[in-house]
């Protein structure tokens, strides 16, 4: 699912490290989390939409890998992102 530009830019501004930052792990995790939340709502209504389910699983895996990377490189930033996005971590 594609996010509206205004929602995407709000997330970018909230999590960016500097003015030109659009691709840091924090930003990517925030955008993926919003897409996952929206697609989860879609899946509640359309349980048999296998193509969307596959995309959802891929997004969850990508976010998990980005979270692992962020945890290894900048643990303080990792904790901040997890708290801001209300993510459950093991």
From Swiss-Prot:
Q: Which GO terms describe its cellular component?
A: cytosolic small ribosomal subunit
A Pfam family matched by this chain, by name?
Answer: Ribosomal_S15
A molecular function GO annotation: rRNA binding
- Keywords of this entry: Ribonucleoprotein, Ribosomal protein, RNA-binding, rRNA-binding
Q: Which domain of life is it from?
A: Bacteria
Q: Name one GO biological process term.
A: translation
Return the PROSITE patterns for the record: RIBOSOMAL_S15
Q: Which SMART domains match?
A: Ribosomal_S15 (SM01387)
Q: Indicate the family of this protein.
A: Belongs to the universal ribosomal protein uS15 family.
On assembly, the entry states: Part of the 30S ribosomal subunit. Forms a bridge to the 50S subunit in the 70S ribosome, contacting the 23S rRNA.
Role summary: One of the primary rRNA binding proteins, it binds directly to 16S rRNA where it helps nucleate assembly of the platform of the 30S subunit by binding and bridging several RNA helices of the 16S rRNA.
Q: What PANTHER family has UniProt attached to this entry?
A: RIBOSOMAL PROTEIN S15, BACTERIAL AND ORGANELLAR, SMALL RIBOSOMAL SUBUNIT PROTEIN US15M
HAMAP family in alphabetical order: Ribosomal_uS15_B
* Protein's name according to its UniProt entry: Small ribosomal subunit protein uS15
Name of the coding gene:
rpsO
């Amino acid at each position: 699912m594609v996010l509206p530009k205004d929602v995407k830019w709000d997330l970018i501004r909230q999590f960016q490290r500097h003015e030109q930052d659009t691709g840091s792990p924090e930003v990517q995790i925030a955008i993926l989390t919003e897409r996952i939340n929206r697609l989860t709502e879609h899946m509640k209504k359309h349980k048999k939409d296998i193509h969307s389910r596959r995309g959802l699983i891929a997004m969850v895996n990508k976010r998990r890998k980005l979270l692992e990377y962020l945890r290894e490189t900048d643990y303080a930033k990792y904790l901040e992102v997890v708290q801001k996005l209300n993510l459950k971590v093991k």
